[in-house]
From Swiss-Prot:
UniProt cross-references to HAMAP family, sorted A to Z: Shikimate_DH_AroE
One GO MF term attached to the UniProt entry: NADP binding
Species for this entry: Methylocella silvestris (strain DSM 15510 / CIP 108128 / LMG 27833 / NCIMB 13906 / BL2)
Gene3D superfamilies per record: Leucine Dehydrogenase, chain A, domain 1, NAD(P)-binding Rossmann-like Domain
The protein, known as: Shikimate dehydrogenase (NADP(+))
Keywords, alphabetical: Amino-acid biosynthesis, Aromatic amino acid biosynthesis, NADP, Oxidoreductase
Subunit record text: Homodimer.
């Protein structure tokens, strides 16, 4: 490989579980581009030094994952509208010697939902979002942008209220125990919690309460099909698996470093699915 070929990364702590190297190196190979993408483990106390010295380390940019996204936002010289709105960065790049940051999570969510459930926006009812972490914030922003009324529920209500306040109280916050009533009129259900992930407790929800035309999106992709998605499919509901968001948020980031917008193909999806299945 050419010594000057661009190098990009995904940084987190821990990071061994990341599928991002599979995704980006697949695109580099398929597009015939010189470059390399690698996982880098950086502990929180060392992150600022890492991010502020990317060029010296030979990187053109990279992805940022837990627990560094909010810290990254505070370190960039320039941030996109999406990053400023979410106060978190998942994509870094160097431009004219300055560190830039973006957040592609909202875009990734919408692309995945549009792909899996075309026409979902026309379904009446509110979007019920479960959880109050960084992913929930990005998804609430995306749904507001599409003109959707959002109902937000989290096991710790105060965290959901903090997200609602961030968006000018646009999402309506409800107690977790009130979810059954909210599901009865929901057009979209999105799980952003870790419930249902391998090694975590299940998400105890009755999808039979949802209207027959509702769509269910679970951002958990380990396992590829959660119990929530299986139950929704069994009822005949349309579902959007979590892997789609992971793949689609990666595409605009790749374009920042390698100047080409890649496509999310069935072949790429199968490649990542196979890697996840091996780890289950």
């Amino acid at each position: 490989m050419n010594a000057a070929a661009p190098r990009a990364f995904v940084v987190g702590w821990p990071i061994a579980h990341s599928r991002s190297p599979i995704i980006h190196n697949y695109w580099l190979h398929q597009l015939g581009l010189a470059g390399r993408y690698e996982a880098v483990a950086v502990a929180p106390p060392d992150f600022a030094d890492f991010a502020q010295n990317l060029a010296a380390r030979g990187f053109v940019g990279g992805n940022v994952t837990l627990p560094h996204k909010q810290n990254a936002f505070g370190l960039v010289a320039e941030a996109t509208h999406s990053a400023r709105r979410l106060e978190a960065v998942n994509t870094l790049w160097i431009e004219d010697g300055r560190l830039y940051g973006d957040n592609t999570d909202s875009e990734g969510f919408l692309c995945a939902l549009d792909e899996a459930a075309p026409g979902w926006e026309a379904i009446p009812g509110e979007a019920v979002v479960l959880g109050a972490g960084g992913a929930a914030r990005a998804i609430v922003a995306a749904l507001i942008d599409r003109g959707r009324s959002v109902v937000l529920a989290n096991r710790t209500r105060a965290r959901a209220e903090a997200i609602a306040a961030h968006f000018g109280d646009a999402p309506k916050v409800i107690d977790w125990r009130d979810l059954p009533a909210a599901l009865k009129t929901a057009g979209l259900l999105v799980n952003t919690t870790s419930l249902g992930m391998k090694g975590q407790p299940p998400l105890d929800l009755d999808v039979a309460l949802l209207p027959q035309d509702a769509v269910v999106h679970d951002i958990v992709y380990f396992p590829l099909e959660t119990a929530l998605l299986r139950a929704a499919r069994a009822r005949g509901l349309r579902v959007a698996p979590g892997l789609g968001m992971l793949l689609h948020q990666a595409a605009p980031a790749f374009a920042r470093w390698f100047a080409t917008r890649p496509k999310v193909t069935p072949e790429l999806r199968r490649l990542v699915e196979a890697d996840i299945e091996k780890a289950l």
